[in-house]
Amino acid sequence: MKQALRVAVSFFMLWAAVLHAEVRIEITQGVDSARPIGVVPFQWAGPGAAPEDIGGIVAADLRNSGKFNPLDRSRLPQQPGTAQEVQPAAWSALGIDAVVVGQVTPSPDGDYNVTYQLVDTGGAPGTVLAQNTYKVNKKWLRYAGHTASDEVFEKLTGIKGAFRTRIAYVVQTNGGQFPYELRVSDYDGYNQFTVHRSPQPLMSPAWTPDGSKLAYVTFESGRSALVIQTLSNGAVRQVASFPRHNGAPAFSPDGSKLAFALSKTGSLNLYVMDVGSGQIRQVTDGRSNNTEPTWFPDSQNLAFTSDQAGRPQVYKVNVNGGTPQRITWEGSQNQDADVSSDGKTMVMVSSAGGQQHIAKQDLVTGGVQVLSSTFLDETPSLAPNGTMVIYSSSQGMGSVLNLVSTDGRFKARLPATDGQVKSPAWSPYL
């Protein structure tokens, strides 16, 4: 935990946060069918009000995953502060088989000790399933809450938690000298800061696998160009600025390659650059449009959008050569896919019956499930553990970000108050 906090602190110490109206989650569909769990407000052992609602952070994280339905605070049968105070029978009577309790205690040096316990109230009543204590300063209290969420989530599901991750996205503000901004925030919209401002459009942010850099498209030179920016010091390196279109960057999971789309020869095709040498080679050819690459976990195969059959569909191709294979067949068109880190599923924009929604496809069975119910949905991006999807949709005259769990149980909106928000990209584990 201490190492994780040091990494996070160094990440932000090198970037002074720029204050904006932050993107915050508003629930649009709950998770009544998910696993019930108790999350008790953490006891505050200091004077006045608690500096942060850690219990609320943990409950929100678990709810956002779609896998848990935290019991409403008004229905809690008791509010214990420690594992010893938990009365298992009171919880099991409500169908709750696990309860999170915790404490926040100020330390003499001005920091805070955040402690949690995950208590079994079902199979082995009273057993502590997981526990930890973190010492953090006030700025990192939310991070401590997300860390507790990650540990609780993994203990109960066997899936690594992704609540300490971040999202990058583009905001178009109303007027000003630099109306386009590339921003980064925690996955839930808190701790937002600006990476880059521009008088011209910014598009398609993509994270390096270690989370230290972002690739994106800029038009500041008068035409599209692909750049990579280091988050720790702001250094920008241009990697592609060919005639016509340069876009849709995507780093391979092993970090050795960057895929993108170019139209320098007329048709829009996929290319792959060796990150170390800068050498670029063409992957697709022909007169069709081939774009929006996303990597499979082997760092050798790409899923991408192509209109070679008339309408956009998702295909798979090996970057070392071979014939692309179509992998989407349901709906009138499918595009802008994102493959999960285990390679078993992908999310995409799927159109059918005049509707454009986010859908999930099982890459083994081919089964498709529509996840979203918003309007003109686009640019889905998966959490690194594959449990949540962030995407943009149209609302009124603008665009907002939305969150949906990959089982479709939980849906939320992240409304922006100072501009249109689009092109979200979920970070790797940080």
Swiss-Prot record:
Presence of the UniProt keyword ATP-binding in the record: no
A single GO cellular-component term from the record reads:
periplasmic space
Keywords from UniProt, A to Z, are: Cell cycle, Cell division, Periplasm, Signal
Pfam families listed in its UniProt record: PD40, TolB_N
Q: Which GO terms describe its biological process?
A: cell division; protein import
What does UniProt give as the signal peptide span? 1-21
Localization: Periplasm
The answer on whether this UniProt entry bears the keyword Cytoplasm reads no
* Gene3D superfamilies tied to this protein: TolB, C-terminal domain, TolB, N-terminal domain
Role = Part of the Tol-Pal system, which plays a role in outer membrane invagination during cell division and is important for maintaining outer membrane integrity. TolB occupies a key intermediary position in the Tol-Pal system because it communicates directly with both membrane-embedded components, Pal in the outer membrane and TolA in the inner membrane.
The record's similarity note reads: Belongs to the TolB family.
- How is the quaternary structure described? The Tol-Pal system is composed of five core proteins: the inner membrane proteins TolA, TolQ and TolR, the periplasmic protein TolB and the outer membrane protein Pal. They form a network linking the inner and outer membranes and the peptidoglycan layer.
Name under which the protein is recorded: Tol-Pal system protein TolB
Task: Give the organism the record lists.
Answer: Enterobacter sp. (strain 638)
